Swiss-Prot record:
This is Cellular tumor antigen p53. Residues 66-113 are annotated as: Interaction with WWOX. Residues 105-295 bind DNA. It comes from Mesocricetus auratus (Golden hamster). A motif ([KR]-[STA]-K motif) lies at residues 373-375. The gene is TP53. The record marks K123 as: Interaction with DNA.
Length: 396
């Protein structure tokens, strides 16, 4: 019985299947190393793992796998130490600003104020300004000319800064920035950082600044005096995100603050206006102006579930009659001079007397007509009775 076992121990290392199984018993850190020499193979066959495998191949393979598992973290090979992909941490929210800039109008010593071009509300318009709302309606990445008017020329080195803030009080501490979708699109960025909302078009001296304390974005350009034949300076701004973008403004109204500053950053003038970036500026301007005229204030946007069409109160198709003006109201009239006062007093008394006589005459005529109607009814009934009496004997 011992001879077959000895023969088996000699024949097993020479077979290909046995060699492949033994190759799997090697530690992971030696898989990519050079092939072992004949001496190392002899040592391998004399090891305890090989002896156990010869007795019971299944248990030996399980034991070798269990032994190789704790040794894997200690291996220094970069292939064996490749970590599993870790889920990316959620993006941290944008920090809130420590201060809210003022947006109150301040003309200063130089009479600083803003102006806009006159434009209609057609569908083809890309930028339009509403004076009654003090609101600019524009399309995404379209030119928005803003005029700067001053009563006297500012000192050399004066700069113009544009900054956007949220209009509503509960959002004022948040920094206005583009949505993630528009941040990833590098179209039209140029020198501007991708998260900046306001850009300046056609000015190579524009500086895009991020305040380290307030975290707010602004764009600064040097002030240029008006050209010959012009009374104002025009700066062309672009807004690079829609007001309805999720993750950005998210339908929250914003204000653009334009400030005039000296080289040291001191304020020389300030003005602001509301901005809405939308697909159809003309239509939105007409809608908001109508709501403003009806209610005296901008109509708040209704949530999607409550946006129902209001039914008219009067469903009848007949036109309503016009209400007559009432003459029972009293008015006070200031008259200079006593003579004029007496003249108007006599005129007023005469008109009052005329109205009283007309009222009395209408009452008398109404009573007389009712009396005639009653008399006429009585005479008709008497005539019928007489005719019946006269016809009575003839019928008999």
């Amino acid at each position: 019985m011992e001879e077959p076992q000895s023969d088996l121990s000699i024949e097993l290392p020479l077979s290909q299947e046995t060699f492949s199984d033994l190759w799997k018993l090697l530690p992971p850190n030696n898989v990519l190393s050079t092939l072992p020499s004949s001496d190392s193979i002899e040592e391998l066959f004399l090891s305890e793992n090989v002896a156990g495998w010869l007795e019971d191949p299944g248990e030996a393979l399980q034991g070798s796998a269990a032994a190789a598992a704790p040794a894997a973290p200690a291996a220094e090979d970069p292939v064996a130490e490749t970590p599993a992909p870790v889920a990316s941490a959620p993006a941290t929210p944008w920090p809130l600003s420590s201060s809210v800039p003022s947006y109150k109008t301040y003309q200063g010593d130089y009479g600083f104020r803003l102006g806009f071009l006159h434009s209609g509300t057609a569908k083809s318009v890309t930028c339009t300004y509403s004076p009654s709302l003090n609101k600019l309606f524009c399309q995404l990445a379209k030119t928005c000319p803003v005029q700067l008017w001053v009563s006297s020329t500012p000192p050399p080195g004066t700069r113009v800064r544009a900054m956007a803030i949220y209009k509503k009080l509960q959002y004022m501490t948040e920094v206005v920035r583009r949505c993630p979708h528009h941040e990833r699109s590098s179209e039209g960025d140029g020198l501007a950082p991708p998260q900046h909302l306001i850009r300046v078009e056609g000015n190579m001296h524009a500086e895009y600044l991020d305040d380290k304390q307030t975290f707010r974005h602004s764009v600064v350009v040097p002030y240029e005096p008006p050209e010959v034949g012009s009374d104002c300076t025009t700066i062309h701004y672009n807004y690079m995100c829609n007001s309805s973008c999720m993750g950005g403004m998210n339908r929250r109204p914003i204000l653009t603050i334009i400030t005039l500053e000296d080289p040291s950053g001191n304020l020389l003038g300030r003005n602001s206006f509301e901005v809405r970036i939308c697909a159809c500026p003309g239509r939105d301007r007409r809608t908001e102006e109508k709501n403003f005229q009806k209610k005296g204030e901008p109509c708040p946007e209704l949530p999607p579930k409550s946006a129902k069409r209001a039914l008219p109160t009067n469903t009848s198709s007949s036109p309503q009659p016009k209400r007559k003006t009432l003459d029972g109201e009293y008015f006070t009239l200031k008259i200079r001079g006593q003579e004029r006062f007496k003249m108007f007093q006599e005129l007023n008394e005469a008109l009052e007397l005329k109205d009283a006589q007309a009222l009395k005459a209408s009452e008398d005529s109404g009573a007389h007509s009712s009396y005639l109607k009653s008399k006429k009814g009585q005479s008709a009934s008497r005539l019928k009775k007489l005719m019946i009496k006269r016809e009575g004997p003839d019928s008999d």
